[in-house]
Amino acid sequence: MGMGTSTFVIRWVNLLTMLLAVAVIIFGVWMSTHNDGCRRSLTFPVIALGGFIFLISIIGFLGACKRSVALLWIYLAVLLIVLIAILVFTVLAFIVTNNGSGHTNPGLRYKEYKLNDYSSWFLKQLNNTSNWIRLKSCLVKSEQCRKLSKKYKTIKQLKSAELTPIEAGCCRPPSECGYPAVNASYYDLSFHSISSNKDCKLYKNLRTIKCYNCDSCKAGVAQYMKTEWRLVAIFNVVLFVVLISSLLSTRFDSEQSFGLLNGLVQISNITFKDCQTTTVPKQF
């Protein structure tokens, strides 16, 4: 790969990184305006990440156009820090979300979830009283449970439905309780349950109570968070590949000259030619 080809890669990788950052910011803003408070609280890190990546790209672009070795050094240093942070977070995300899955029940299409199946990190976060009060408030306001009776008119429809983890865990008692369903959001609690599961006593038909204090509800939230984290981890892998391409291509150019410093100056000169077409770059 020649110098021109490598510099071409740097320019286009920077452009792709900037476009990716803009897309991340737009997605974060969209999430903050089209979702309830439960998910909206997760959008700030998304917007912040997009803004930070955009800032890095601007630093690299200005460093090349203004022939500033200092800016290019800053660009490389910050880019390396971001790469390490993304790598660490992605590895931790895959480790934390490795455990936990749904359990099938005869006659039901949807799965049920058990809190102890998930990682100790999830258990610590969801068993924290202040955290759960906040999450429970969001779940009640979202009225997902109230909407079940409108979505599924009959018990047969409910049993054949693919309920979300939160609907399955927070809106109904665990199947082992044995409470007969009157409709999709109301159960006959006069039935004497022989199950030792404490969730059976915690469930109430009241809209603000349901099974929001149950471990099954926390397990449903854990499964939801696991899915979200996996998506973020996959996105981070793509982002890592894009950023590492930028770092490696910059390093390759640096190795073509008499050391990293001269390499950075050479990159800035070549890129400066595109930014200032009337200026003849100095040849090294």
Curated annotation (Swiss-Prot):
<feature type="topological domain" description="Cytoplasmic">
    <location>
        <begin position="1"/>
        <end position="11"/>
    </location>
</feature>
<dbReference type="GO" id="GO:0016020">
    <property type="term" value="C:membrane"/>
</dbReference>
<comment type="function">
    <text>May be involved in the regulation of cell differentiation.</text>
</comment>
<feature type="transmembrane region" description="Helical">
    <location>
        <begin position="12"/>
        <end position="32"/>
    </location>
</feature>
<dbReference type="Pfam" id="PF00335">
    <property type="entry name" value="Tetraspanin"/>
</dbReference>
<keyword id="KW-0472">Membrane</keyword>
<feature type="transmembrane region" description="Helical">
    <location>
        <begin position="229"/>
        <end position="249"/>
    </location>
</feature>
<feature type="topological domain" description="Cytoplasmic">
    <location>
        <begin position="250"/>
        <end position="284"/>
    </location>
</feature>
<dbReference type="GO" id="GO:0009734">
    <property type="term" value="P:auxin-activated signaling pathway"/>
</dbReference>
<feature type="topological domain" description="Cytoplasmic">
    <location>
        <begin position="65"/>
        <end position="75"/>
    </location>
</feature>
<feature type="glycosylation site" description="N-linked (GlcNAc...) asparagine">
    <location>
        <position position="183"/>
    </location>
</feature>
<protein>
    <recommendedName>
        <fullName>Tetraspanin-10</fullName>
    </recommendedName>
</protein>
<feature type="transmembrane region" description="Helical">
    <location>
        <begin position="44"/>
        <end position="64"/>
    </location>
</feature>
<feature type="topological domain" description="Extracellular">
    <location>
        <begin position="33"/>
        <end position="43"/>
    </location>
</feature>
<comment type="similarity">
    <text>Belongs to the tetraspanin (TM4SF) family.</text>
</comment>
<keyword id="KW-0325">Glycoprotein</keyword>
<keyword id="KW-1133">Transmembrane helix</keyword>
<feature type="glycosylation site" description="N-linked (GlcNAc...) asparagine">
    <location>
        <position position="99"/>
    </location>
</feature>
<feature type="glycosylation site" description="N-linked (GlcNAc...) asparagine">
    <location>
        <position position="128"/>
    </location>
</feature>
<keyword id="KW-0812">Transmembrane</keyword>
<feature type="topological domain" description="Extracellular">
    <location>
        <begin position="97"/>
        <end position="228"/>
    </location>
</feature>
<feature type="transmembrane region" description="Helical">
    <location>
        <begin position="76"/>
        <end position="96"/>
    </location>
</feature>
<dbReference type="InterPro" id="IPR018499">
    <property type="entry name" value="Tetraspanin/Peripherin"/>
</dbReference>
<dbReference type="InterPro" id="IPR044991">
    <property type="entry name" value="TET_plant"/>
</dbReference>
